[in-house]
Structures are given as structure tokens and as C-alpha cells.
Amino acid sequence: MSQEYTEDKEVTLTKLSSGRRLLEALLILIVLFAVWLMAALLSFNPSDPSWSQTAWHEPIHNLGGMPGAWLADTLFFIFGVMAYTIPVIIVGGCWFAWRHQSSDEYIDYFAVSLRIIGVLALILTSCGLAAINADDIWYFASGGVIGSLLSTTLQPLLHSSGGTIALLCVWAAGLTLFTGWSWVTIAEKLGGWILNILTFASNRTRRDDTWVDEDEYEDDEEYEDENHGKQHESRRARILRGALARRKRLAEKFINPMGRQTDAALFSGKRMDDDEEITYTARGVAADPDDVLFSGNRATQPEYDEYDPLLNSAPITEPVAVAAAATTATQSWAAPVEPVTQTPPVASVDVPPSQPTVAWQPVPGPQTGEPVIAPAPEGYPQQSQYAQPAVQYNEPLQQPVQPQQPYYAPAAEQPAQQPYYAPAPEQPVAGNAWQAEEQQSTFAPQSTYQTEQTYQQPAAQEPLYQQPQPVEQQPVVEPEPVVEETKPARPPLYYFEEVEEKRAREREQLAAWYQPIPEPVKEPEPIKSSLKAPSVAAVPPVEAAAAVSPLASGVKKATLATGAAATVAAPVFSLANSGGPRPQVKEGIGPQLPRPKRIRVPTRRELASYGIKLPSQRAAEEKAREAQRNQYDSGDQYNDDEIDAMQQDELARQFAQTQQQRYGEQYQHDVPVNAEDADAAAEAELARQFAQTQQQRYSGEQPAGANPFSLDDFEFSPMKALLDDGPHEPLFTPIVEPVQQPQQPVAPQQQYQQPQQPVAPQQQYQQPQQQVAPQPQYQQPQQPVAPQQQYQQPQQPVAPQPQYQQPQQPVAPQPQYQQPQQPVAPQPQDTLLHPLLMRNGDSRPLHKPTTPLPSLDLLTPPPSEVEPVDTFALEQMARLVEARLADFRIKADVVNYSPGPVITRFELNLAPGVKAARISNLSRDLARSLSTVAVRVVEVIPGKPYVGLELPNKKRQTVYLREVLDNAKFRDNPSPLTVVLGKDIAGEPVVADLAKMPHLLVAGTTGSGKSVGVNAMILSMLYKAQPEDVRFIMIDPKMLELSVYEGIPHLLTEVVTDMKDAANALRWCVNEMERRYKLMSALGVRNLAGYNEKIAEADRMMRPIPDPYWKPGDSMDAQHPVLKKEPYIVVLVDEFADLMMTVGKKVEELIARLAQKARAAGIHLVLATQRPSVDVITGLIKANIPTRIAFTVSSKIDSRTILDQAGAESLLGMGDMLYSGPNSTLPVRVHGAFVRDQEVHAVVQDWKARGRPQYVDGITSDSESEGGAGGFDGAEELDPLFDQAVQFVTEKRKASISGVQRQFRIGYNRAARIIEQMEAQGIVSEQGHNGNREVLAPPPFD
């Protein structure tokens, strides 16, 4: 390659003029501003403060800070996605100004005007194209304001496709005007680039690295003698040279002639600064230069053919491997993975003092850590005398003698006359003799001598092939020493180094991948004459290159020449097998993959021990079963289905045993005895019913001698009337006593047959029935496997526990029924109930939490990503509101808006003289004109002179209970009656204190979220208070909403579902209120909090306060009882209207008394109804319950009933509510927190695991009357007007509530109560189908 002429030039600094200084400084500042602007555009966040963002409460995310956020928002608003190109245009303009700063040409104003027109056309058309075809970015239009105007103008005229075409044409014209480029020139340039790319790709595809000649990027005159190389050029090399010349001539048509040598160096796979072309592996073995896969070099050596072993079949005697070992010591190449040791001294012919240089030198390959196996050329004849076992080089480290390194004797120019050298004792092959030559040959050009290799056979291998024989050594003419020139080092080309390093790593991976794994050979056998070259897997890795070279013609002579030396060093390698297991590998093409390990097949005995029955054992097992069966009942036979069922039953029993060993019996003693009796009776009835269904299902075929199945044998159920006779899927808790012999093939038959023979099992179970209570009958039938069989076993109502004791005695199962009576704790929790059925008061033990209150992890977390507020859409909606109000001749300006999770409030500044009532009357018309579901008008906003207009959001967000509970307002509130309602329109949580309400009235239609709101309040108190602080009385007529809380320790009594019990519970609350008032008056306190403080103070003084109102006959206590801390009581009624309509007007008086006086006693009411009518929510109740919550109602009348004002009829439902707090006349709009059923069940289960409820007796029982509070009883006082009303009714002979109401001028409720008292006394009849009553009493006597 010709050397480029360079001249040393001295760099001088020239001073710039003042104008240029200012220009370059200004350009640098503009470029920095463009970089800052690009960072601001890329890091834009809609929540940052900007021109379109009015309120923000978060840290700034933009990298450019607040100015960057403002500027990015403005650019996106104007240009859309084209704003990203503005920094690029700024940098390009700076570059253009810097390049043309020295030009002093005059200014062509016409050209400037054309460029300005072109710039404007490009900007406008680009924005328009983006607006028509691209998606919007964030909440901006894709083309910005400019693109939106163009698109809205062109689409009605030309449609989207026509507008796109028109804008493209204008864009093309603008590009020409701005740049001055002709589109013909642009097309030619694009075509030239495409052709260059295709030419480059096609040449690169056809190119082969191994055929690139070194002369393409090396100067022949400087580095090599061209005439001398052509003298030794072979026919093959000449053919290849001609092909390369033709390819270069073709490439000259498309590639710059000045860059040919650079391209050749780039694609040749060779570094420009390589010193030598010999490729060595990490273990010192030369890589075959003709191996395209591993060497990565040329496959041709066109300079030399006289000594080419491929063309001349000359013996390979060149010591390349020894030279490689020396080179690894001198150069910084990778060390060999396996140890390569020196050859021990052996008496032989001396090594020649000087060796010829390596003639065949490939390009240096990668420094691999594994030896490279070079495949032998195809033209070489294979020698049958040479073969190599694999075991001899497998483990040289385990031998006491240091392994012998294979030695390659050097060869001279005449291989036929060269003697084969062996290492001498006084001069071992160390590598020092070769290092000097290698260092010289590293920088030398390719020599004229051909490398030849001679394989030196190790001493330990010789007895395997043939006996050592003396071989005559032929004289060899010594070659003339070659004067070598040191090749000058060239400067590194770093890009080529990177390419070469990458290829070197790839070749290392390939070499390591295809490295063979030797397999051990147990017994050496002599190699037959018909054996060909050894396999790849049998070649030792140390001599990888030389192991393939026996195909050369001189290998046989070299092997025979080393016979004597090999005999001396025979014990170097041995056939000792390694101690550890050798990996089994599979030979073939590709990586050596280990074969799978051998798997030991278990015997029949082992399979039988695991319960696996082989088909061959079936006959023997059936015979054994029949033999045992004949001992007890002759004639009983079983079919295959029954045998399989019994085997499944046995497996189920074993599984139950393992489950008991895993979980133990730690919770069997926690159940009270009375609960055990009730649960055991219920489970026995379920077992009987399930046995009936199973018998009907499988009663097709019975064994001979079996008695017919009778349900009378299993009649035992005190709760039979309460259970359904339908089939039930049982749920077994797998807890079984550990059995001693789990696998017995005969016993399951007895166990399976028992349910079908009710007579015999009754006789067998007579003795266990007297010893064991009925509770333990579910002690062991818990088998989750094969439910059809295992459920038939517990059909016995009396202790079927021995059914699982049978398999323990395979020979004499009769005594099994005498042994199972072991004192075992009862397990009433093991039931036959379906897992999907809810069971109230379930005693199944749970893991007791360690925290005093439930964790928030039980609730559903809110989503981490919050959708940003679309301020642009809000601005558009504000303008639309103003326009719609103007249509109704109302002038108003939207001064502010408050976006919330569900609705957005727009604050209207009305013009002077405009009344707010006008907007309230237009609420429905505004909803219609704004295309919204509902519009609520807030006439007065506290603290502001504006009118609020609440519109629903397009995308409604869900308010999660967890995010409301995880708030400082809720956590910091010390009251145990703190409840959360949801979020207001500003997104702030709304927290209320039930102790300050003090009672709550909730109303809403079905589906409005009323029950969800009640659940949210209950969960709030469960997350705030312990059972000793707050207790609940829940009344749920629908038996759906509040029944899920059954079993929590906060309950005073079970969830009340009967209306009679509900009235009794309210009466108990009134009596409890009176009792607490007496105690508080005795202690001189005014509320329950003061009472509890007195009790706590007495406890700290260690002087408890005795009950001042206790009498010896009041209770069975032997000592005087003391006062204890009283919890708050919350009475929750889910359907108040149903309670009022079912029980009667008596409940109204009880609720009124509680609402009036119960606040100080710590009793609070939460009444929920879906019918807020005046006959349900009376004036007396409303007067005493000031705090109200209104969900969506059906009409303004209902809204006025619950809130005393309209507005609830325009709510959105699904938790949207109006909350009227205590001492407040203006309701607050709140979006209720959403509670899932899974969350409720999770919290309930968490509290159930903490403890059991301590119910108070007598809450739901009525001691005064058996009929409850449904009507008049003897103890109730008659109305003062009762006698006068009776006289009026008997005289008029017409009984009606309205007549009594008009006659005595009393309220409707009082008149109705008087009529009911008359009905109870028998004066009037019951109300007929038409609503009339008959007067039964005779008329008064005159």
C-alpha cells in the first residue's frame, strides 16, 4: 500500500476579530440553549407548572425547571410534535452561520425572502400533516394550534387524504424554496445512496474473508519481494489471484479507487498493525490456517506452492506446536487451561542448533483458552498404523510422573532426507531455543520455506500400537539459514482492532464449543490395520493439531523413529481410571452434550410401599382379600370398581394422616362443649343426608349377603328440620390421627362396605358408643382424596372413628372396634359443609395476628399512576358553560374550577342583577345542553361570592378505602368512633366522628352505594377501636349486608335478622341507657368518657368502685360487683323502613328515646333506609338526628325529606353522596370510598382470628311479653284519649284513623296507635282487604 505523503505543519493560533468573537460566543450560547430546550421538551410532564396548568402541588419533574416547563408547554401547544425539531433547527442554523462567517458576499434580499417563505411553508405544512395523521401528544394536539387550524380548514374541503396530499405538495415546494435544491437532484442523490448501499451489501455478502489477499492492503515493494513470491506461486494460488483481480475490477465501478485499500483492510479480517500471521491457540498448538471456522484467515497462500503439503503431498515436519508453546511464553496471550509440561530428558539424537523459520504463516488468530482442532485436508492419505486412544491423555494430573509434552521435530527444506529428532537428556525442549527464533519470525515476512510437521509419539502410547523397532535414519540436508528482515511496526488502527477482537472472541467461543470431551477406555486394544484416523473425541486436547496430521506421508516414519525414546519414557502415561464418574457424552457434529444419568427403576416392593399397585399384583391381592373376606363373611365379593374405590379410600386415609402430621391438633381444645354438641349434631345430620344421596347414586350393585340400606339405621339429628335434604359437597379438614401401618390392601374393603350394612356395624359399635361422645365422630374421616368413598364412612351417627383403625390390623380387624376409644379432643370444626357456604360462628382456628389492629395490607391498594388533569379540556368546558348560559340569557364568567375524582365544580361569577335561582331552575336544561348526566347547582359556596356548577367528569376515578384510611386525619383522630366517608370534590379525605354526630341517618335508592358506605364506616371503626372500646348491635332485615360481620369480637349479640328481636334489641339499648345514666349520676360525670376516666383512675389507685345499685338478689355473685369500663355501643340498622313497617310504631318511640338521650350514655344510632319518605323518617326522628347522608334519591321530595333541601336527586350514584354534618346547614358533596366484598371478608377474618365475641344474654329476648313489641301488650299504658275514642267509634260505627285524627285533632301516628289498641282490645276488627275495619263492640247504652 502506497504511503501517503505528509508534511509537518506548525499549528499557530490566530486572533479573531471582535465581530467574530462575539459571533462565536453567541453561537455557543445558542447551541447550549438548544440543548437545554431539548432536555426540557424530552422531560415534559403535564403536572408541572405551565401555561395550561393552573394549580400544582408536586415537585417539578422537568429537567429545565419551571422555565423549561413553561417553554415546553408553550411550544407543544403551538407546534405540537414538531416542537421536538426546533432545537435541531437551531443547532443547524448555528452550524450554517459558523461555516459562512468568513464569506463576505453581498446579501441577496430576494433569496432571503424566498427562504423565509420556504421556512413558513415548511412549518405550516409540517404542523398540518402532524395534526391530520399523527396522534395527539399528552393533552396537546399533534400539530399544535397551527396544525389544528389547518386541519379544521382543509378537512371539510378536501377530506383527510386530499388535505394530506395538498400539504405534501406545499411542503415539497417549501423545501425547494428554502434550500434551493432541485427535486431532480434530490432523486439522483437518493438513487445513488440506495445503489451504494445495495452494492456494499451485495459485495459484503459475496465476500469471504479467507480469500482476501494480503496484497490488497500491503505494499509489495516495502514488505515483500513480489518477484520472489511469483516464482513459488502455485496453480491454485494463481487461480485465486485471478478471481480476486476480477472482483476488484468489478468493485472499481462502484467504489472510490482511493478507498479500495482501506475497504480491503476493513473487510479482510486482519489488523493493519499485526506483526505476524501465525495463529496459535492458548495451549500452544498452531491452528490450521485452512480451517475457515477456527482460524478466521485466508484459505490460500499464493506465494508458495513448492512446499505446499496440500499440492505436493510433502510430510509435515514443521514444529509449529513447539513454536507456539514458546510464543505463549513471550507474548501476552492467554495461558493454557490444561497444564502443558516439558518433555522429560530422553536419550536420543541432539536437537539441531538452528531451525528454519516458519514458512506457512497464517494471520494471527484469537487468543483462546482452549485448543483448536484443525481438520485434516482431504487430499492426505490416512495412516492405519497411527491411532490414539482417548484415555491416555485424560487425566495426566493424577499420575505420579509428570506427563510428557508432545514434541514436534523440526524439518528442513528436504523432508525426504531429514532425520527425526528426539529430545536429548541433557537438552530438554524448554522453549528457550524456540523463543529467539519466534521473536525474529514475528516481524519477518513470509518465508520461502514450507512448514512441515512430524508427530512425536509419547512413550506411553507405543505399546498400544506396535512394539518399538529400530528404524534407520535417513540423512537430511540442512537448510540454508534465511536472512530475515524485521518488519517495521505500523501504527494501530483502533477500529480494525475492535473488529479483530470481536472476531477473536467469536472464534474462542466456537473453539470452546467444539472442543471434544475424551471418554475413558477401560482396556487398550491393538489398533487393527483397517482402522482409519482416530475420532475427534479420542484426540487429546494438548495435541489437537498434531493428532489430525497423521494423514501426511511422513507420519509413519516419525512414529517408528521415536520407538526407542518412547520405550525409555514408557511410564509417563498410564491407563489408570479416574476415581470420579466420567460424564457420558455423545459424539457427533455440534456441541458435546452430556447424556442423562441413569435412573434406577424401583422394585415392586418399593412401589407397593408407596401405595402403587402394579397390574401384575392385582390377582395376588384379590386372592388375599378374598381369603380374609371368607374369614368374616362368606359369600361377599367385590367387583373391580369397588376395589378401586377402596384403594382410593386407602390413599385418602394416608393423605389425611400426613395432613395431621403437618398441622397437628393444636386447635382442638379451643371449642366450648356446648358448641361442640350442636356442631356434632348438625354434622351427623349432614352425614346421614349425604349417605342417602350416595346410596341412591351407587346402589346399583351390592354384594351377596348384604342387607338392604335403610336410612332408619342412621336417624339421629336434633337439627333435622333446619337442614336441607339436597346433596351437599363436604369440606374435610385433613387432620387424622397418625396410623402405624398406612398400607394394607385388605382393610379398605371392610371400611368401604360398612355404610351398606347398617345392621352389623351397629353391633360392632355398641361398645364405642357408650365410651365416646358423639362429638368425636368426625375425628378421622377427613380425607380430601376420593370423596365418594370417604364420605360414606362418617354416615354412622355414633363414632365412626374406628373405620380408619381397621387398616392397622390386616389379619384380625374384629378387635379394631374395641381399641379406638381413645380420649381425643373433639373437632367440631371438621364439617361436611361446602367451602363456598358461609357458616356463622365458625370455630375453625386461624393464625392470630400480632398487631393490635388489622393491617392496611388487607385492603386493595390504589393504583400508583394517577391520570393527570386535562386542563385543556376543562378550559374548553368552561367556555362551553359560558356559551350555554348565554343561550339562556344569563351572563356569567367561569373564574375557577376545582377538578375532583368524580365531578368538577365550576365557579360562576354572575353578572349584576342575575339571581342564583334562575340557574337552579335551569339545571335540567343545562344538563341537556351540556350532554351530561346531571348538573347540580350550588347556590352558595362558603367564603366565596360565586355560584357553583358541578359537572361529572368523563373518566370517573375510584376512591379506595385504603387511601382514605392511610391519612393523617384518620390516624391522628383519638376518637374510637372515627369513620371515613370518602373524598370531597377537591380530592381531600372526609373524616367524621360518630361521637360528635351523635347519630346518623343514611338514605338512598337501591344501587346508590348506601350499603357500601355503611360497610366503609364499619371497617373504619374496626381499624380504629378494640372490642373493649366499641361494641356493635347490627340489625339486618335483608340478611345480606351486615351478616358477613357475624363472629367478630365487637358484637354484643348475633346479627339480628328477625324484626321481633330487633325491637327487643332496641328496648335493651333503652334499658342500658337508663342504667348508664344512673351510674354516671352516681359518679358525678356528664358523659361516658368521664365515666371511663373515673374507672381508670380507680384502677390506678387499686381501689375499684363497687356497683352502688346492686342488690344481693339481682345476680348470683357472691361478692359485691365492681364497676368496669363501659364501651361505646353503635346500633346499625341497614333497612330502617322495613323495620318500621314490620314491627310497628313502637320502634319509633324507642328510636326517638335513644336519639334524644343516648349520646351521653355512649350509644349511637346509624339508620339506613332506601325509602326516605315521611312515614318512615318522621319529624320526631329528624329532629333528634341532625347528621344525615343522602345518596341518590328518586325525587326532590325525598331529597327534602332527608336533607331539608333539594340536590340529592341530581347525584351520580355509585357512592356519590351529600353529607350534612352536625351544626351545618350546607351539605358537602363527597365521593364515597369503595369497599369490595373481599376486603370486608379479609378484615372480618382478621378480627375472628384475634378472638371470639362475648355475647350478652337477654338482648334479643323480651321478658315482658312473648309477642315482642309488635303491638299493644298488657303492660303498655293506654292513651289518655282511648276511652273517648272508643265512645266515638262505637257511636259512629266506623273505625278509621283519619276519623279519629279529625275528631280529636291529634297526629296521624297517635290516632293509628289508638286504633291498634282498640284492635288489641277486640273493639274493632283487623283491617280488611279494602282497608276498612268493622266495629265489633256494641253501641253505648243510653
Curated annotation (Swiss-Prot):
- Could you list this entry's UniProt keywords, alphabetically sorted: ATP-binding, Cell cycle, Cell division, Cell inner membrane, Cell membrane, Chromosome partition, DNA-binding, Membrane, Nucleotide-binding, Transmembrane, Transmembrane helix
Segments traversing the membrane: 25-44, 75-98, 116-132, 163-179
- What are the recorded GO MF terms, alphabetically? ATP binding; DNA binding
Q: What's a GO biological-process term for it?
A: chromosome segregation
Which CDD domains does the record match to this protein? TrwB_TraG_TraD_VirD4 (cd01127)
Tree of life domain: Bacteria
The segment(s) forming the FtsK domain are 987-1200
Any signal peptide, and if so, which residues?
none
Q: Where is this region: Disordered?
A: 346-386, 409-489, 604-639, 688-712, 741-862
SUPFAM superfamilies xref list: P-loop containing nucleoside triphosphate hydrolases, Winged helix' DNA-binding domain
Database matches in SMART domains: Ftsk_gamma
| A Pfam family this chain is assigned to | FtsK_SpoIIIE
Q: Where does ATP bind?
A: G1007, S1008, G1009, K1010, S1011, V1012
Q: Where is the composition biased (Basic and acidic residues)?
A: 619-628
Where does this protein have compositionally biased stretches of type Low complexity? 409-430, 449-480, 741-829, 849-859
Per UniProt, subcellular location reads as: Cell inner membrane
Q: Which residues lie on this side of the membrane: Periplasmic?
A: 45-74, 133-162
Cytoplasmic compartment residues: 1-24, 99-115, 180-1342
- Name the Gene3D superfamilies for this protein: 3.30.980.40, P-loop containing nucleotide triphosphate hydrolases, Winged helix-like DNA-binding domain superfamily/Winged helix DNA-binding domain
Q: Does the keyword Nucleotide-binding apply?
A: yes
Family according to the record: Belongs to the FtsK/SpoIIIE/SftA family.
The free-text domain remark for this protein reads: Consists of an N-terminal domain, which is sufficient for the localization to the septal ring and is required for cell division, followed by a linker domain, and a C-terminal domain, which forms the translocation motor involved in chromosome segregation. The C-terminal domain can be further subdivided into alpha, beta and gamma subdomains. The alpha and beta subdomains multimerise to produce a hexameric ring, contain the nucleotide binding motif and form the DNA pump.
Q: What is this protein called?
A: DNA translocase FtsK
Q: What is the lineage of its organism?
A: Bacteria, Pseudomonadati, Pseudomonadota, Gammaproteobacteria, Enterobacterales
